[in-house]
Amino acid sequence: MSVEIGLTFANAGESSQREFWSALEDGGELLAFATSFTGQTISDPRLLHEAVTHPSCVSKPCRSYQTLEWAGDAAVCLAARNWLFHRKEKLSVPTLVVLESTLTSNQSLAYIGHLNGVHRVIDHRMSELPSRFESYKFQLKRGLWATDPPKVVPDVVESLIGAVHVDQGVE
């Protein structure tokens, strides 16, 4: 079954969806993964499920990650700016802008997501996505900036951070 952590949900049947919801309601492995990844506990399981649901899951009873990704994008940028402001205050603004762009780029976020297994928890209905994850893994051997990561990974990284932001507010 594709419900357990470590597998994507490509073409998962309705029984897998029920098991996934049940695991969410029980706390489940997805909650443990998200807590480990973000360092925060997301108290609303619906937000957690939304954070990993790709738009290809149109028949799902929840929204896709897109709105949480939008919120997470802002939170990631703010966190990067805060980190740079306090640790690199002597750098010029143009240099800070370049560093912020680098820290928040799809390549950087995809790499962080890949290292932490974000690609394994994405609920999707895209048959080509698992092979894109494998291709990305091999592209990394040429260097981070030589990659074309599947956009879904940095999107879900941002949406998980967005879920924390929505669930807990700004701190």
Please provide the spans of the model-predicted regions.
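RNase III-family endoribonuclease catalytic core
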Residues: 2-171
